[in-house]
């Protein structure tokens, strides 16, 4: 009985994986084109955001962070996953352009490059942090 149930599940999983359709892009080249369009939009928006939100960064630092965020997902090759990341990136861009994000929300992207806080007692002691 259990073997029949697992066989049925495997058949259903196989059928589901073959019937999954891409979100927007038909192939990886089209997905890459969408990524480049999103990257260009972010690249053009950085000076406006830095000026409008009076950020404590330069335009070059903002553009470098945009590049870093895009390169973080450069290994992704599945067009469906790429499309999903592009959709999320467009939502972030729209929130930034329409100033639905506040200054602190944008500056949170720049705290990832800080050194992580020490975890063990001696490292905390040497750094001057409370245990």
From Swiss-Prot:
CDD domains: Complex1_LYR_NDUFA6_LYRM6. Pfam families: Complex1_LYR_2. It is found in: Mitochondrion inner membrane. It is a peripheral membrane protein. The keyword Transferase does not apply. Disulfide bonds: none annotated. Coiled coil: none annotated. Keywords: Electron transport, Membrane, Mitochondrion, Mitochondrion inner membrane, Respiratory chain, Transport. GO terms for cellular component: mitochondrial inner membrane; mitochondrion; respiratory chain complex I. The keyword Protein biosynthesis does not apply. Belongs to the complex I LYR family. Accessory subunit of the mitochondrial membrane respiratory chain NADH dehydrogenase (Complex I), that is believed to be not involved in catalysis. Required for proper complex I assembly. Complex I functions in the transfer of electrons from NADH to the respiratory chain. The immediate electron acceptor for the enzyme is believed to be ubiquinone. This is NADH dehydrogenase [ubiquinone] 1 alpha subcomplex subunit 6. It comes from Mus musculus. The gene is Ndufa6.
